[in-house]
């Protein structure tokens, strides 16, 4: 049987931590920043840890743990 391939879109968007959690970029910063307060924009920086339910789905896309 051949090796499982990693989904290209998933490897660009998600990172697996050493403890097995999945990190992703914060959503909601593509456009429409003018109506948001500076605090809201600041809080959108960085990454968030996905919920266990979402992490389970994403891990199927990253069989090699990229």
Swiss-Prot record:
Ranges where the record places region Disordered: 1-35
Biological process annotations from GO: translation
Gene3D superfamilies the UniProt entry points to: 4.10.410.60
Keywords assigned by UniProt, alphabetized: Ribonucleoprotein, Ribosomal protein
Family assignment from sequence similarity: Belongs to the bacterial ribosomal protein bL35 family.
PANTHER family according to UniProt: 54S RIBOSOMAL PROTEIN BL35M, LARGE RIBOSOMAL SUBUNIT PROTEIN BL35M
Protein name: Large ribosomal subunit protein bL35
């Amino acid at each position: 049987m051949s090796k499982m391939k990693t989904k290209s879109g998933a490897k660009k968007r998600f990172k697996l931590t050493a403890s097995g959690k999945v990190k992703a970029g914060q959503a909601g910063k593509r456009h429409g920043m003018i109506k948001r307060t500076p605090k809201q924009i600041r809080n959108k920086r960085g990454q968030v840890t996905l919920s266990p339910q979402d992490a389970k789905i994403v891990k199927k896309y990253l069989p090699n743990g990229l």
